[in-house]
From Swiss-Prot:
Role noted for this protein: Allows the formation of correctly charged Gln-tRNA(Gln) through the transamidation of misacylated Glu-tRNA(Gln) in organisms which lack glutaminyl-tRNA synthetase. The reaction takes place in the presence of glutamine and ATP through an activated gamma-phospho-Glu-tRNA(Gln).
Subunit structure: Heterotrimer of A, B and C subunits.
Protein name in UniProt: Glutamyl-tRNA(Gln) amidotransferase subunit A
Annotated family: Belongs to the amidase family. GatA subfamily.
Isomerase found in the keyword field: no
MF (Gene Ontology): ATP binding; glutaminyl-tRNA synthase (glutamine-hydrolyzing) activity
Keywords: ATP-binding, Ligase, Nucleotide-binding, Protein biosynthesis
Keyword Manganese in record: no
């Protein structure tokens, strides 16, 4: 018997009643992972021995009835440090790297007696939108194995969507949680910048990166955010603002809520059927008592260009630490120190990572800094001001998560610009440091469509309130791919 169809609260009740043990739940989860892994390829590492050892220790001391997450398995994206468990960032450069410390988000999960079941596949160093740049494997969409799962947190999304695990963690720099959540029909939240500590996250774009949760439902997503969100002295960008319980508004009605629908989010490049799906969702919110009105975010069209200058520049700096000297891959054909650096980085990084390092180095170089990096920062401020103006009058922003449904494997990975444009609806949220969620909102050609809700900083509980209200009157989150046990 599999337990992957049970909610976290249902699993908790079974554990407290001793109808199952943490060890049995872990064993069943490992079976679910193994039986589906060949089809989807969600994991780089499955930490079977460590997980079973941890489960046995939890059983020995007993399940805490007041701790919802006690004994619950968790999958973790492979750029989030886990002590003693390989953490590769899906790169040859870190193919053998075992951290000697846990990321704060992982430590918080361990503190609640969650069980890290394994590390999920991703685009190399989180650079990509299809989980095709991984050094180890290509993850496949849970609904159609000829399609991409999205990225860069593709493995974390498919692990939940395919029924391998109930909960997972990803990271989001320009849409890397929300886009794969949309492509796989699950709930993915990018929290306000600073809500979840970045300590232990292998850095890509330090002013953009944020760890966040995946789950099948809105409430379970909020329950996982309750675990991992915390202030942290080890992260200088950690925010002091905290919500006591991110589930506190779930179940409340949304009568009187004002929701903005930016015309730019339904314009050029958006699939007409996705546009129809979003407009139908807007009508559903109106039926629930909210007001939905069209607004403008005029500078959002510059988001992709701004993002790839800023993110690549930050990556160029962050990835300087990978040199083959202290840890990770080292080229064995070097005769001197210069050759160690050059050969290791040339052989250890994949093409997309090298492309972004070069772009970032160029943008920061003498004579080009003002024209590119400085100007990108100025336009970023204009994008932030656009959001501020809208949020002066509205509670939330509504729109599609992605311009299309999941595209085919090996269709965009040789066209960087087309791949970059797939993030045009999610990138502005990262540039502004805002919270954003993707929830299931329908299907086009049998593939899931994601609906994005964006709020002002530190309004995750309001986002969850609106998302849960929509979820309560729709059944998209209940529909499952064949690999999970559904009929799609």
């Amino acid at each position: 018997m599999s337990f992957n169809h049970k909610t976290i609260e249902e699993l908790h009740d079974l554990l407290v009643a001793k109808e199952i043990s943490a060890t049995e739940l872990t064993q069943k989860t490992l079976e679910d992972i193994k039986s589906r892994e060949e089809a989807v390829g969600s994991f780089i590492t499955v930490s079977e021995e460590a997980a079973l050892k941890q489960a046995a220790a939890i059983d020995a001391k007993g399940i805490d009835s007041d701790n919802l997450m006690s004994g619950i398995p968790l999958a973790v994206k492979d750029n989030i440090s886990t002590k003693g468990i390989l953490t590769t960032a899906a790169s040859k450069m870190l193919y053998n790297y075992e951290p000697i410390f846990d990321a704060t988000s992982v430590a918080n999960a361990y503190a609640k007696d969650m069980i890290v079941i394994g590390k999920t596949n991703m685009d190399e160093f989180a650079m990509g939108g299809s989980t095709e740049t991984s050094y180890f494997k290509k993850t496949k969409n849970a609904w159609d194995h000829t399609k991409v799962p999205g990225g860069s947190s593709g493995g974390s999304a498919t692990a939940v969507a395919s029924g391998q695990v109930r909960l997972s963690l990803g990271s989001d720099t320009g849409g890397s949680i929300r886009q794969p959540a949309a492509f796989n029909g699950v709930v993915g939240l990018k929290p306000t910048y600073g809500t979840v500590s970045r300590y232990g996250l292998i850095a890509f774009g330090s002013s953009l990166d944020q760890i966040g949760p995946f789950a099948p439902t809105v409430k379970e997503n909020a329950q996982l955010l309750n675990v991992v969100a915390s202030s942290d002295v080890k992260d200088a960008t950690s925010a002091p603002v905290r919500i006591a319980d991110y589930t506190s508004k779930i179940g409340r009605d949304i009568k009187g809520m004002k929701i903005a629908l930016p015309k730019e989010y339904l314009g050029e490049g958006i699939d007409p059927e996705i546009k129809e799906t979003v407009l139908a969702a807007a009508k559903q919110f109106e039926a629930l008592g909210a007001t939905v009105e069209e607004v403008s975010l005029p500078h959002s069209k510059y988001g992709v260009a701004v993002y790839y200058i800023i993110a690549s520049s930050e990556a160029s700096s962050n990835l300087q630490r990978f040199d083959g000297i202290r840890y990770g891959f080292r080229a064995d054909d070097a005769k001197n120190l210069d050759e160690i650096y050059v050969n290791t980085r040339s052989q250890g990084f994949g093409d997309e990572v090298k492309r972004r390092i070069m772009l970032g180095t160029f943008s920061l170089s003498s004579g080009y800094y003002d024209a590119y990096f400085k100007k990108a920062g100025q336009v970023r401020t204009l994008i932030i001001e656009d959001f501020d103006k809208v949020f002066a009058d509205y509670d939330l922003i509504l729109g599609p998560t992605t311009p299309t449904v999941a595209f085919g494997l090996d269709t965009l990975n040789h066209d960087p610009v087309a791949m970059y444009l797939a993030d045009l609806l999610t990138i502005p949220v990262n540039l502004a440091g805002l919270p954003g969620i993707s929830i299931p909102a329908g299907f086009v050609d049998g593939l899931p469509v994601g609906l994005q809700l964006i709020g002002p900083k530190y309004t995750e509980e309001t986002i969850y309130q609106a998302a849960a209200a929509f979820e309560a009157v729709t059944d998209y989150h209940k529909q499952q791919p064949i690999i999970f046990g559904g009929d799609k």
